[in-house]
Design a protein with these regions (language model features):
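A conserved beta-strand-loop-helix scaffold within acyl/acetyltransferase catalytic domains
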Residues: 2-51, 55-66, 112-250
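Aromatic (often tryptophan-rich) hydrophobic motifs at membrane interfaces
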Residues: 49, 57-60, 73, 79, ...
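Conserved acyl-donor/pantetheine-binding loop and adjacent beta-alpha core of acyl/acetyltransferases
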Residues: 65-77
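Long, mid-chain structured domain cores
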Residues: 93-94, 101, 116
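Conserved alpha/beta cores of soluble small-molecule-handling proteins
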Residues: 99, 105, 134-136
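Anion (oxyanion) recognition and catalysis
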Residues: 101, 166, 295
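Conserved GNAT acetyl-CoA-binding A-motif
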Residues: 103-114, 268-278
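Residue-level detector of anion-binding/catalytic polar loops
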Residues: 106, 171, 300
Length: 311
């Protein structure tokens, strides 16, 4: 039996320490990241203790009697340590289902942590989803990921863009000018989809100040004018492109091709470079043009899965 405690702000330090020592948590689960937008979500995260020792965490929010893990994060999932066994994970899911059912929830929607983010094998939760929860897969997004020690050659279309950008004199450098990049990103998203980025420029700068080594911006510039860039989220096993965008001049001159050529040259001391999803948020419909570009750099498929079960 586990003692189940609902997360409160007083648990912040203990929570963050557990995430840092876990086998599958990343800085996205750190409360200094999660809580930047806590006004948008009603938190209902759980902490699982055994004999007074913290064994597992579930980052979650509630909405309309549905429990989500977690709507404000790219991925959710149960956070555990290397010492946690399969039997214990099965027990955790049995007890968390009972807890949330007593609390009046009728459904759980669960975003699993993709395996590329695991520091040690961590798929005990996937087994529990079928054996304990009878969960069903309701959404599968596909991302493009490079195994950094076995990179494929770039395709000719990507090489052509790289040559074009080099001939134009485009320069690649790390930057803290989040406002300049956000303006390019916002214009692109607004023109294409009529939406704004998930993060505001102010939020990105706040998160950068809290995680200076994990959040990094690289820009492609011409005569000091930003033409495009990418914001990278760096975890122990993955460099992930949280945002990628270029203006019209940058697109015509191959700015992003040269940008990723230079970024992929760097020694990141991680296993994977992940370009992120190429599927729509609502329908999982594949954006073929987008995935063509990512696969041109050598990216291949990794899935981000979402499950659902009733209580």
């Amino acid at each position: 039996m586990f003692e189940i405690v609902r997360y409160a702000a007083s648990h912040k330090d203990e929570w963050n320490q557990f995430v840092a020592q876990s086998k599958n948590g990343t800085f996205l689960f750190d409360r200094n990241y999660m809580d930047y937008h806590n006004d948008r979500f009603e938190d209902h995260s759980l902490m699982f203790y055994k004999k007074g020792k913290l064994y597992a965490l579930l980052a979650a929010n509630e909405k309309d009697h549905i429990l989500y893990s977690h709507q404000g994060l790219t991925y959710g999932g149960l956070i555990t340590t290397v010492k946690t066994t399969t039997d214990e994970v099965l027990q955790v899911f049995h007890e968390l289902n009972a807890y949330y059912k007593r609390a009046g929830f009728h459904k759980i929607i669960y975003k699993a942590i993709p395996s590329i983010y695991h520091k040690w094998p961590s798929e005990e939760d996937l087994y529990a989803l079928t054996s304990i929860c009878q969960a069903r897969l309701i959404m599968r997004d596909i991302s493009s990921t490079i195994l950094l020690n076995k990179q494929f050659p770039f395709t000719e279309s990507r090489k052509s863009g790289m040559r074009k950008a080099s001939q134009a004199g485009i320069q690649i450098s790390e930057s803290d000018d989040f406002d300049a990049f956000w303006n390019i990103l916002q214009a692109n998203l607004h023109n294409k989809y009529g939406i704004n980025p998930v993060h505001t420029a102010a939020e990105l700068k706040l998160l950068k100040s809290r995680f200076p080594h994990q959040i990094r911006l690289f820009l492609a510039t011409l005569d000091d004018k930003p033409l495009g860039g990418t914001i990278l989220f760096i975890t122990p096993t993955v460099v992930h492109t949280q945002y990628i965008s270029a203006d019209e001049e940058g697109k015509q001159k191959g700015a992003l091709d040269l940008l990723f050529k230079e970024i992929l040259k760097k020694d990141w001391n991680v296993d994977y470079f992940d370009f992120g999803k190429s599927t729509s948020t609502e329908s999982c419909e594949l954006n073929r043009k987008l995935i063509f570009q990512k696969e041109g750099f050598g990216g291949r498929g990794i899935c981000y899965d979402t499950y659902e079960w009733t209580l």
